[in-house]
Amino acid sequence: MILACDVGLKRIGIAALLNGVILPLEAILRHNRNQASRDLSDLLREKNIQVLVVGKPNESYADTNARIEHFIKLVDFKGEIVFINEDNSSIEAYENLEHLGRKNKRLATKDGRLDSLSACRILERYCQQVLKKD
């Protein structure tokens, strides 16, 4: 199975590719980086993940890229790690919330649903860029 994550300072959005369908999973709430990396490691083990797709912004965001790379090094994972450009994935995910009212959009932003929808976009890009080549 393939899992994608959108690493943020407060939450880590999670999405999985299951039988050709991309599904958002419950986001990991990040209290500190060690707890969050442990939670992600546990999830990768529980779901028997072979490929972890990680969203990263373009090179002009050097600090963010360094933070994401450092976090991923803390994750206990022996499978393949693929970095995919995440530019605008959060904006695209937010546009997917058009059907929600303003209050529910705010709640989706706070509880991690938006982050997991962003992880879905990252996983879609992985499927388009990497899996199509095979």
From Swiss-Prot:
**What Gene Ontology terms describe what this protein does at the molecular function level?**
nuclease activity
- The portions of this protein that span the membrane are none
Q: What does this protein do?
A: Could be a nuclease involved in processing of the 5'-end of pre-16S rRNA.
- Sorted UniProt keywords: Cytoplasm, Hydrolase, Nuclease, Ribosome biogenesis
Q: Matching Pfam families, A to Z?
A: RuvX (PF03652)
Q: Where in the cell is it found?
A: Cytoplasm
* Location (main, coarse): cytoplasm
Q: What is this protein called?
A: Putative pre-16S rRNA nuclease
Known Gene3D superfamilies for this protein? YqgF/RNase H-like domain (3.30.420.140)
Q: Which PANTHER family match?
A: POLYNUCLEOTIDYL TRANSFERASE, RIBONUCLEASE H-LIKE SUPERFAMILY PROTEIN
Q: What class of enzyme is it?
A: hydrolase
**GO:BP terms for this protein?**
rRNA 5'-end processing
Q: What is its EC number?
A: 3.1.-.-
Q: Does the keyword Cytoplasm apply?
A: yes
Q: Which family does it belong to?
A: Belongs to the YqgF nuclease family.
Family matches, as SMART domains: YqgFc (SM00732)
Provide GO CC annotations from the record.
Answer: cytosol
Q: Which ranges of the sequence are coiled-coil?
A: none
